[in-house]
Amino acid sequence: MQTSPLPRRTKIVATIGPATQSKEVLRQLIQAGATTFRLNFSHGDHAYHQQSIRLIRQIAFELNQPVGILQDLQGPKIRVGKFLNDAGSVQLKNGDPYTLTSRPVECTETISSISYEYLADEVPSGARILLDDGKLEMLVEEVDTVARDLHCRVIVGGTLSSNKGVNFPGVCLSVKAMTDKDKEDLMFGLDQGVDWVALSFVRNPQDIDEIKGLIAAAGKSVPVIAKIEKHEAIKDMQAVLEKCDGVMVARGDLGVELPAEDVPILQKKLIATANRLGIPVITATQMLDSMVNSPRPTRAEVSDVANAILDGTDAVMLSNETAIGKFPVEAVAIMAKIAERIEQEDINPSQAEASRTSIPNAISSAVSQIAETLNAAAIMSLTKTGSTARHVSKFRPKTPILAVTPHVDVSRQLQLVWGVKPLLVLDLPSTSQTFQAAINVAQENHFLRDGDLVVMTAGTLQGVAGSTDLIKVEVVKAILGRGVGIGQGAVSGRARVASRPQAIAQFTQGEILVVPSTNADCVDMMRRAAGIITEEESLTSHAAIIGLRLGVPVIVGFKGATQKIRDGAIVTIDAQKGLIYSGALPPVSKG
């Protein structure tokens, strides 16, 4: 059996919109490499988003693949009013006087209303105002607190259209991070079972506390992503990131709030901080923007995606490219291709400075080093909350991470975490049983094959986040069958198979006896056997009793053993687990 190459490590977030509403296009996006879908709640009503969620869940089920859903809340976006002329816009020239007011007025060539009540109280004279993502700029020359007006001068003119966004760089506004609409949208998203919630325009840790409090009050535990797009959040970066469960480098508004030339440096700092904290980070906005209208990206866009991956981002995001673009599937496919090529290079950012002071961090760091030293085929992480897998991912191991979880929501959330391939496996009574079931699932999906070495990690307090404290190394073996084990330990040897014991002409010391049942004539062979396998399943059978007396591992009740095991084949029996594998135990190094 050949192993299939494990998926690329960098995850891809695709935004849903008019271009990607059909079932067939969504299917193609997943097949092209999208691992999480973003629902932009700045657009569309609840019925629209509900339909998107249902389609995503249906297609993910059909493809037997976990797919995450990220709810992106609109936030308190401040906008100009609506121009009632035929064009729905006005032309502003450099040097023109213009008034912005919080009063409800008819918007014209000289005045526009602004959707912020405390405009004249908080925006001072001399402040810069940017409109339409920075395309237009004004300077506040006079503040009239009585009339609630800002008298401005146009610095950079252009077309100002209805409902365009307004930014106040360097001005601290008291606007709350969550509007009433955001709260309604959040409750809807939680009810629909979204996997992540992104909070827009985060300013401080208290904004994260507020949304987490609402989620907890609703009886949910959905993780929160902080969208960093305000200068206040940059000043309080460490504290904000310590509170949230993930972070988005929202380069659009960030590049308006701060000088555009600062954004690349801030991107690197945000990614590095998120990596150290072990939370997923998404790099977003205009990554392949030319693909809205073109089937191929520019060279600069390819470099932008590549450099975000080299910086250490967990995921790269497509916005307009998949929401309204002409080539949504091609955009995802090209982004996946870029990621796969970059990941071939051994230039992942070093995590040597990442904190190892906690037990989970120390274990996860050791797992990564052990896997690399032993050239393991995979790291298998047993996790109920996703914490163990995230801890391992934090150290950016070269070895693929298979995250074993019984929870569908956790498997979908991990589709945003670098290097992690979720495997859904039932919650079995013991860690060893769960690991064995996971190996079987991985083999069925061709992620592992016989003889592969796997480094396993888990927490002995299962279901408790941050309790990772176990490392185990195993060799993958094909399971031939199972029965009831008697005795202790695991042994390997050459199988001596016969339909009746008397048919075995010669039995050599250390071989494994495989027969339907044993009797008194078999005792001499049983003394020389390394192990015994019988089809008879009684715990009071001759094989069970004599094997126990002789201290020889026995497995009884393996139906069809004499047909399924080939005479002369090397097999391993594990009496503790009741399993029979093909192949031998790995050699034990000495010295």
From Swiss-Prot:
List positions binding Mg(2+).
229, 253
Q: Which reaction does it catalyse?
A: pyruvate + ATP = phosphoenolpyruvate + ADP + H(+)
Q: Which residues bind substrate?
A: 38, 252-253, 285
GO cellular component terms, A-Z: cytoplasm; cytosol
Q: Which residues bind ATP?
A: 40-43, 79, 164
What cofactor does this protein call for? Answer: Mg(2+); K(+)
- Cite the binding residues for K(+): 40, 42, 72
UniProt site (Transition state stabilizer) = 227
Keywords attached to this Swiss-Prot or TrEMBL record, sorted alphabetically, are:
ATP-binding, Glycolysis, Kinase, Magnesium, Metal-binding, Nucleotide-binding, Potassium, Pyruvate, Transferase
Q: Which SUPFAM superfamilies does this entry report, sorted A to Z?
A: Phosphoenolpyruvate/pyruvate domain, Phosphohistidine domain, PK beta-barrel domain-like, PK C-terminal domain-like
Pathway connected to this protein: Carbohydrate degradation; glycolysis; pyruvate from D-glyceraldehyde 3-phosphate: step 5/5
PROSITE patterns to which the protein is assigned, alphabetical:
PYRUVATE_KINASE (PS00110)
Q: Name one GO molecular function term.
A: pyruvate kinase activity
Against Pfam families, the record matches this protein to: PEP-utilizers (PF00391), PK (PF00224), PK_C (PF02887)
Kindly state a single biological-process term from the GO annotations of this entry.
Answer: glycolytic process
EC code: 2.7.1.40
PANTHER family, alphabetically? PYRUVATE KINASE
Q: How does it assemble?
A: Homotetramer.
Spell out the family assignment given in the record's similarity comment: Belongs to the pyruvate kinase family. In the C-terminal section; belongs to the PEP-utilizing enzyme family.
The protein in question is named Pyruvate kinase 2
Which organism is the protein's source?
Synechocystis sp. (strain ATCC 27184 / PCC 6803 / Kazusa)
Q: Which gene encodes it?
A: pyk2
